Amino acid sequence: MSKQVEIFTDGACSGNPGPGGWGAILRFNGTTKELSGGEAETTNNRMELLAAISALNALKEPCTVELHTDSKYVMDGISKWIHGWKKNGWKTADKKPVKNGELWQALDEANRRHKVTWNWVKGHAGHTENERADELAREGMAPFKKGSFKPAASAPKPDAQLKQPVATKARRSTQSY
């Protein structure tokens, strides 16, 4: 039987494009792990995607996942649009490259490793975990906001095409999933 994990994700951006951050909460068997990261120049949609990708990639083995996002972009993309994009060689219906295509491909790969049920939650509506994921996203963005930018060492890029977050933090990690 695969491990059952609950994930809550959010992305944030100051300006669009501008400095941005993402946050994720992973909950398994009474243990909570919080992740966050950010980029100096990005969009809110990229941060929403990176939150989901980073959370799913943090799982060490295939799991049954309930993933909660407040992003209609991520929900529609993963549940509706992605099938056509893949069929069309990662092109839209009008033959243009999919925006954030490298991130969609990374999310597709991460999604296929697990049994994921995707859930949409209304953002900024008092949903406790979504509010915390938003706080984590803002924390991830903070080092890149004007006046507080401190260059961080880049994490090694496992996929040269995939833009990895420059800074990633994990908190309250007592067990690897």
From Swiss-Prot:
Reactions it catalyzes: Endonucleolytic cleavage to 5'-phosphomonoester
Cofactor binding summary note: Binds 1 Mg(2+) ion per subunit. May bind a second metal ion at a regulatory site, or after substrate binding.
Disulfide cross-links: none
Xref: PROSITE patterns: RNASE_H_1
GO MF terms, alphabetically ordered: magnesium ion binding; nucleic acid binding; RNA-DNA hybrid ribonuclease activity
Family matches, as Pfam families: RNase_H
Subcellular location: Cytoplasm
Binding residues annotated for Mg(2+) 2, in chain numbering: D10, D134
Cofactors that this protein relies on: Mg(2+)
Entry coiled-coil feature ranges: none
InterPro entries given in the database record: RNase_H, RNaseH-like_sf, RNaseH_domain, RNaseH_sf, RNaseHI
GO biological process: DNA replication, removal of RNA primer
Protein's UniProt keywords contain Lipoprotein: no
Annotated residues for binding of Mg(2+) 1: D10, E48, D70
Domain RNase H type-1: start-end pairs: 1-142
Annotated function: Endonuclease that specifically degrades the RNA of RNA-DNA hybrids.
Assembly and binders: Monomer.
Protein family: Belongs to the RNase H family.
Entry protein name: Ribonuclease H
Organism field: Mesorhizobium japonicum (strain LMG 29417 / CECT 9101 / MAFF 303099) (Mesorhizobium loti (strain MAFF 303099))
Source organism phylogeny: Bacteria, Pseudomonadati, Pseudomonadota, Alphaproteobacteria, Hyphomicrobiales
Gene: rnhA
